[in-house]
Amino acid sequence: VLVNRLIYDVGKPERFDIVVFEREDHKKNVKRIIGLPGETVQIKGGYIFIDGELLNAEDGLEQVSLAGRADTPIKLEDNEYFLLGDNRDSSEDSRFPNIGNVKREQIQGKVWFRIFPLLKLDFIHSR
């Protein structure tokens, strides 16, 4: 993937952006922003709720079969984001304590272009 590292110098990460972030173990991951600073995220019955309201997710995004720590409401701090992988059943993301809420300073940029696999060269759109 190609990453725009400058975009968040002039703007803020938005819901559904696909971002690269650095985990506390210094590994890099690519995930989608679901929860924004100040919001409360919960996963109930396979659906994502933001501040108690059902999230209208993008077409093609899978339901969440495992809520993890989001089975109870998670309040995000002013600089925290809740990230999920698009392949919900096999993604290590904010639902799990080893990732948890991702701080703004951990986000390194927005995914802009996919170059692998070669048959799927494509620009990445947030919505």
What do the predicted segments below correspond to?
Residues 1-127:
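Soluble "head" domains of membrane/secretory-pathway proteins
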